Amino acid sequence: MPYKLQESFLNTARKKRVKVSVYLVNGVRLQGRIRSFDLFTILLEDGKQQTLVYKHAITTIVPHERLEIEFEEAGVPGQG
């Protein structure tokens, strides 16, 4: 069930083309828009540069604007 919330968050950011900051476990901050994602990776795009980031290396993803996520659709009861 946690994957559904993660998937909803990432998909909303991708569809709305919201710029995000991605913080890695080593302290590095990456910025860009989510182009695509799967179970293990996120493809970030910033201009012409693409970066494939493994999810296990990520600590935090911060959208640069508020995302409206449908919690019931994400499988999180009582949050809608």
From Swiss-Prot:
SUPFAM superfamilies per record: Sm-like ribonucleoproteins (SSF50182)
Swiss-Prot/TrEMBL keywords: RNA-binding, Stress response
Gene3D superfamilies: 2.30.30.100
One Pfam family of this chain: Hfq
UniProt-listed GO biological process terms: regulation of DNA-templated transcription; regulation of RNA stability; regulation of translation, ncRNA-mediated
Sm domain residues: 7-67
UniProt key word RNA-binding: yes
A GO CC term attached to the entry: cytosol
Highest taxon of source: Bacteria
MF terms (GO), sorted A to Z: RNA binding
CDD domains assigned to the protein according to its UniProt record, in alphabetical order: Hfq
Key word Ligase present: no
Subunit structure: Homohexamer.
Homology family: Belongs to the Hfq family.
HAMAP family per UniProt: Hfq
Function summary: RNA chaperone that binds small regulatory RNA (sRNAs) and mRNAs to facilitate mRNA translational regulation in response to envelope stress, environmental stress and changes in metabolite concentrations. Also binds with high specificity to tRNAs.
Record-linked NCBIfam families: Hfq, PRK00395.1
Record-given protein name: RNA-binding protein Hfq
